[in-house]
């Protein structure tokens, strides 16, 4: 490439995508969604990525900086021998400070992840603001997840069990995690169009909740969510902290 190239496209959902590629290999992708959400993803020639997302009023929802080289985590976890398949991913997400340990050099990889914890992880990934007010009655001020839940609800990444109840201490299921990941992907400008047929390869794909089919299918199609063996998806199973790390790494 000897000169700057610009391409534009309109997705099926009406989003307008503009991609500017410079001769040095750096790239800027701007996505303007019909609801007014605008994302800009800048990738430098060295592979560092900055993602900025604003809402229809111009308020910044995401200002994420992801280095090409992931730093080593400050803590060397000593309890990852039960989940060797997740060790690399856990160290990556810990290096990015998305997920913390549970104390005394432990990560607790097979412990379940709660809804409040996942909202907090996605908030850290977004590097979004911390001054939103939570509208949920069961999200008290000053809890570790308070800011994360408030941001995630504002950004449309999470929804409550009802309009007033979020259930932050409830464990999250594989299908709930997939839906939240797909919503986050849409927020930052990725094309989240999915084909429900992606679930047909699993013997229990039809056990996926109707509300979750699109999100789960998108995660399956993009290799973020994989089966569990014997061609099962197990969509309603609890998600462990190790599984969350692996899905974030694939994302």
Model regions: which residues?
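Interaction-mediating elements
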Residues: 93, 118, 152, 177, ...
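Feature responds to low-complexity, polar/acidic, surface-exposed segments characteristic
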Residues: 65-87, 100-148, 154-175, 181-213, ...
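Hydrophobic beta-strand positions in blades of beta-propellers and related beta-sheet-rich domains
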Residues: 29, 49-51, 118, 177
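Intrinsically disordered, low-complexity repeat and linker tracts
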Residues: 1-15, 23-24, 34-36, 44-102, ...
